[in-house]
């Protein structure tokens, strides 16, 4: 018989990449990156129940396309935490309600993992300090350490360097996620590896623009290495970008992470009009309005 010990409801938010530089593959098969990641107020919900008896992790998910067995990143998080902490495994149930789209470049899975890892640490008496938790998170996935701090940050290396930056942007963000296709991270990096020339974002300028809250200047400095590769190989992405540029002329659209989500910054005055145009003239996409969490 399962006796419930503690119940928690946690909200694990998404992120956007405000620029992403990817560098040539290292000898270990991985790429170093340089990026500004900013948390946004679009969140998954996790109801987590700890039981008093020993056992394993059980996951239920609202999105039936997401595996709930050992392939789920929450399982990896659970396994690594208990292996490292030497705590006895308790039975834990997670009911996961997905609001962050998959294959979107918004860090949904990494966010779930980061917030679950923080909850495990808290539940067991803060076994690790923040720095130690970031190192543990790195073993789960390269975007997971960012969600330990969960503040706008410059992320470097293979995701292991997370340095906070000041973000004074006041604009809203419109996310555009295609419904009938996504981009796998593997596909994105393979496309990047075949690029002959890469245009890089200037993060010194981006950091200055964020501090000043200067969206116009910021937009002129954003580049995404993975997008440049994907636009060469993925017809769906190429058509989506062309459609966005033609439907809302004069606005700049940026890919987050490895895609397939695009986003644009909007003022309060233009938000409603641009949202309406996108919903009217761009087929098979989900439109989400959000803001960065500063």
Curated annotation (Swiss-Prot):
Residues where ATP binds: 101-111
Transmembrane segments: none
Cross-referenced InterPro entries: GHMP_kinase_C_sf (IPR036554), GHMP_kinase_N_dom (IPR006204), IspE (IPR004424), Ribosomal_Su5_D2-typ_SF (IPR020568), Ribsml_uS5_D2-typ_fold_subgr (IPR014721)
Signal peptide coordinates: none
Catalytic activity: 4-CDP-2-C-methyl-D-erythritol + ATP = 4-CDP-2-C-methyl-D-erythritol 2-phosphate + ADP + H(+)
Pathway(s) annotated for this protein in UniProt: Isoprenoid biosynthesis; isopentenyl diphosphate biosynthesis via DXP pathway; isopentenyl diphosphate from 1-deoxy-D-xylulose 5-phosphate: step 3/6
Molecular function GO terms recorded: 4-(cytidine 5'-diphospho)-2-C-methyl-D-erythritol kinase activity; ATP binding
Protein name in UniProt: 4-diphosphocytidyl-2-C-methyl-D-erythritol kinase
